[in-house]
Amino acid sequence: FYTFQMISYGADVYRGTIRAERNLLNLGLYMSFFPKMIQGPIERYQGMGACIRNRHVTPELFACGARRFIYGLGKKVILANQFGSVVDKVLANPMDQISGGLGWYVGILYTLQIYFDFSGYSDMAVGLGKMLGFELTENFNYPYLARTVGEFWRRWHISLSGWFKDYLYIPLGGSRRGTLITCRNLMIVFLCTGFWHGAGLSFIAWGMYYG
């Protein structure tokens, strides 16, 4: 997250989208703002810089942020951790002892665990940000209600998808150079997305599948 933010800041300054920040304290706060350091969201300086310069905290905003933080903590502790506990217990058994039905059940639980874990952290980050007077990017928009793969990626880890679109997909040419180049660009983006999630072959294969 830290690296992606530095790249976006440097690219935006180079493109002239934003002016270079002369105040090192403001720039340092943007780079190291602790609520977003663990699981994001990936913030652009254009938005967060305005929050830094015009930050204000009200009792209403603090209370709203506290509720959001508690909501995210509940998703992480009550849902994600419990689903994860069941998944770990089942997967501790030899694979040949796991029936097809149980495998599907664990697969569904693991899918829910990932969502509630990641979105829970994002909710806590947004909540802490509000409590401190910052408006952070919403990272999830009910992705499992999406009807297509494209819609899913517009709803899942929104700040990461937007980052890859603006700093990789569009600079590569986006969809402006014909079908073959568009497919190549999408494959590169999803390979990088898979590698971002993990350096193992399974994540690379996952990225190639979606690409």
Regions found by a protein language model. Give the residues of each.
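Membrane-embedded transmembrane alpha-helical bundles that form the catalytic cores
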Residues: 1-211
